[in-house]
């Protein structure tokens, strides 16, 4: 996004999840977005919309909020935490007359099948599911064989699948 000249970049996503016995009030994608904007010197103040479940309805509601807050000055782009949320965001933008990608760009995460059927079609990060599964199985086997809790931070390959909701420079 930044290499395409986008400087005002917002975030739209859900909140919280439970893993094991631990509840996490903030989704890791939002944490990554905050870190990323800080490192790049981007101001995301007032451009983060994160609440609710990872659903189309949540996306529509948060998309409507973003339009109401920025109708006359839409951010250059939004990163959306999941394709299901992005479907609702695109619906809200279309209903409000916000044209994607002319008025703002949208990039999502997961590259689910629905991404190719939205209007406009959704640019989305594809996460290598095979690599993710292999890594999880390897980590599980290590934890079982060592009989102790191991903590790993692992980066999984992603590929940006460019469709109509974002036109790179």
Task: Specify the residue positions occupied by each region the protein language model found.
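Bacterial carbohydrate/catabolite-sensing allosteric modules
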Residues: 1-169
